[in-house]
Amino acid sequence: MENLVALTQEALKLVADAGDLNALEAVRVDYLGKKGHITALMKNLGGLSPEERPAAGAEINKAKDAVQEALNTRKQLLEQAAINAKLASEVVDVSLPGRGLHTGGLHPVTRTLQRIEEIFAAVGYSVEEGPEIEDDYHNFEALNIPSHHPARAMHDTFYVDDTHVLRTHTSPVQVRTMENKKPPIRVICPGRVYRCDSDMTHSPMFHQVEGLVVDKNISFADLKGTMDQFLKAFFEADVPVRFRPSYFPFTEPSAEMDIQCTQCRGKGCRVCKSTGWLEVGGCGMVHPEVFNASGVDPETYTGFAFGMGVERLAMLRYGVNDLRLFFENDLRFLKQF
């Protein structure tokens, strides 16, 4: 039993000195494992007399319990120390300033489209869309553009085949709307359009928004008032607006819309080519032939239509002088919006 006391004290000292869980496990195996020093004493009980065995067995079990309890206590301390060390290594210094997230932004053309839609939605217009590959009838014939019209030429239009084109305007959406809905109609038709043209102010693909109003007793005065109020709302300024007589095969009478130059306030500059005015779109009263082709009675209803280039409006609103910047995906340009 003297050997038992020495082994117990030795085991307890090693437990107390164990610096990590691996060292602690090694102590347990050495003293309480199947071949451990204290476990081996139990195997020697057979050499004692029957009278001595119970007392000796009780002493050995008491020693085992003492060592096991010390092991458990030390294990808890070491585990907690490991957790504390891990937490200390992963601590977040809340006094540091936060790092801002680099979020994306909307493209200026998208911003412009959304702004146009919001302005017209506020006065009761709905948004209509249509196919970008359009048939000859809806892109030309139904809009009073006969086969001999210059717009049909290959140098102006992208032809997919003999009877289909990449739409040259969103006016076909107006025709489809009149075919499928009965007046009164108040819609705008935004979307991509395609033309054989490319320079600083033109792109083979660009965005256009057209509008259509059909009802009884619609007049040119309604058109002028609508466009005047829209342009003032869009540019957030009391910009002077003028209408110049023009020609479009699908409207009669027709007009071009100009606003006073936003750069020189009408005095004349390089942007407006010294005229003091900037063109923003075309408009007019819907031609009776377009009504007939769309199934609307021109004797009962009248209407007006207008069309504007979205990139053109974006250029004027944001002061951009080259249309191609909108399509180059240059972050130095896009981050400004």
Swiss-Prot record:
E.C. designation(s): 6.1.1.20
GO biological process, any: phenylalanyl-tRNA aminoacylation
CDD domains: PheRS_alpha_core
Residues annotated for Mg(2+) binding in this entry: E252
Catalytic activity field: tRNA(Phe) + L-phenylalanine + ATP = L-phenylalanyl-tRNA(Phe) + AMP + diphosphate + H(+)
SUPFAM superfamilies: Class II aaRS and biotin synthetases (SSF55681), tRNA-binding arm (SSF46589)
Coiled-coil segments: none
PROSITE patterns registered for this protein in UniProt: AA_TRNA_LIGASE_II
Subcellular location: Cytoplasm
Cofactor note: Binds 2 magnesium ions per tetramer.
Pfam families for the chain: Phe_tRNA-synt_N (PF02912), tRNA-synt_2d (PF01409)
Keywords: Aminoacyl-tRNA synthetase, ATP-binding, Cytoplasm, Ligase, Magnesium, Metal-binding, Nucleotide-binding, Protein biosynthesis
Entry cofactors: Mg(2+)
GO MF annotations, alphabetized: ATP binding; magnesium ion binding; phenylalanine-tRNA ligase activity; tRNA binding
GO cellular component entries: cytoplasm
Similarity annotation: Belongs to the class-II aminoacyl-tRNA synthetase family. Phe-tRNA synthetase alpha subunit type 1 subfamily.
Self-association state and partner proteins as the record states: Tetramer of two alpha and two beta subunits.
PANTHER family membership: PHENYLALANINE--TRNA LIGASE, MITOCHONDRIAL, PHENYLALANYL-TRNA SYNTHETASE
Name the UniProt record assigns to this protein: Phenylalanine--tRNA ligase alpha subunit
Organism of this sequence: Cellvibrio japonicus (strain Ueda107) (Pseudomonas fluorescens subsp. cellulosa)
Taxonomic classification: Bacteria, Pseudomonadati, Pseudomonadota, Gammaproteobacteria, Cellvibrionales
Gene for this chain: pheS
